[in-house]
Amino acid sequence: ILYLLRGGLPWRMLPPCFPPVSTVRRWFYLWRDNRLWLGINHALLMAARETRGREASPSAGVIDSQSVKTTESGGPRGYDAGKKIKGRKRHILTDTEGNLVHAVIHTADIQDRDGAPLVLAEIVKRFPWLRHVFADGGYAGNKLKDALRRTAKWTIEIIKRSDTAKGFEVLPRRWVVERTLAW
């Protein structure tokens, strides 16, 4: 997996030192469907937090999304009118240190505030103490606040740019999720 992620290679271009492509692909999809990758991410996140002297389960997170173009035909995709991109949207939640807690991929036409409950509903059981979320202005609105309260008593704090800022501005709490998306 790390080999494919690093090189961005299609399955058929795996080097000959690997097992047959069909075997590697079959095991990857089997592990994905059994949610093994989620379990691995969960264990690594908790271990990394404990190593740094933090509680294993985060109590706060930072949510954001990123629209990306898709060139392939077929598959789910939509049009993000705000970013003028036809493709998919990566919706991620990180802890306050920028470690990935959960990610959801969906069509780009889903607004941020409509995609947030999809991300947060998945992690209620795995991270029971995570109840506060920092977000940007795209998540503002009572519709999202009501949905989060119904899901699991979430609270959301919108971190906005100052009205006088020009150009790029590092925002407290928000920069960690931006860094994670950039990687």
Model-based region annotation:
Residues 1-183:
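Short alpha-helical elements
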